[in-house]
Design a protein with these regions (language model features):
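Beta-sheet entry/capping signal
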Residues: 16, 36, 154-156
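Short coil/linker segments at helix-helix boundaries
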Residues: 34-58, 104-123
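Secondary-structure boundary/capping residues
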Residues: 37, 80-81, 138
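Short, flexible loop/turn elements at secondary-structure junctions
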Residues: 41, 79, 161-163
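An aromatic- and glycine-enriched ligand-binding surface/loop that stacks and positions planar moieties
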Residues: 69-70, 84-212
Length: 212
């Protein structure tokens, strides 16, 4: 492992780490909105004093975006190993972040403005990802959930499960594992099932446009 790591330039290793940091901060911000931002410049003694409102909503999006931008600028177009991000992975994440950021909110979570400049950035980034030719839609949606098709062309970034690493069940992302259908043998979980109201919200007319 050390030999493989040593072959990658320092900037590329930094980009991988910043991408992962951006990945987790994006998830945390998406869930909680106002979160403390702790990076390498914060001393160990200062961590407990960092406020979750040190940055505005927009500024915090920008802080997270800096990691994705650094990753996009310093990662290769093709990763050396499955599970590592590349420049298009970072651009896809940056596009998703800018899409969220474009819908500007007040402190009560009301949308106060739709930033067209950010939306144009989303279009530019997603076009770059699409035109890379690396991704596409599977011929069968179910393949996205079958192990023999893992890391398929619909997968932008997937945490790889490890085996025989000393842990009880291997390193696995339980946040997504909880989404599998309820089944007696599992005794769980079937989270995040769409309601009929949600389905209705996405109904379209014959012209393909949503019914509001």
């Amino acid at each position: 492992v050390q030999a493989r790591v040593g072959r990658r330039p320092p900037k590329q290793r930094q980009a991988e780490m910043k991408f992962v940091r951006g990945h987790f901060y994006f998830l945390v911000k998406n869930h909680f909105k106002k979160v403390p931002y702790i990076d390498e410049v914060i001393s160990q003694d200062s961590i407990n004093t960092v406020s979750n409102v040190q940055y505005s909503n927009n500024d915090l999006w920008n802080k997270i975006a800096e990691d994705f931008q650094f990753a996009a600028d310093n990662l290769p177009p093709q990763a050396e190993q499955v599970g590592r991000p590349d420049t298009y992975t970072a651009k896809a994440y940056l596009a998703k972040l800018r899409l969220y950021q474009a819908y500007e909110q007040d402190d009560n979570n009301n949308v106060t403005n739709i930033n067209k400049e950010r939306l144009n950035e989303v279009v530019t980034l997603t076009n770059e990802v699409i035109n890379s030719g690396k991704y596409g839609l599977s011929d069968d949606y179910a393949k996205n959930y079958l192990w023999k098709y893992e890391n398929g062309k619909e997968s932008i970034f997937a945490v790889q499960r490890s085996l025989n690493d000393g842990s009880e069940v291997g390193r696995i992302d339980m946040s997504t594992a909880l989404n599998y259908p309820m089944y007696p043998a599992y005794g769980c979980c079937s989270f995040h099932r769409p309601s009929q109201n949600m389905v209705n919200a996405f109904q379209t007319g014959l012209d393909g446009l949503p019914k509001f």
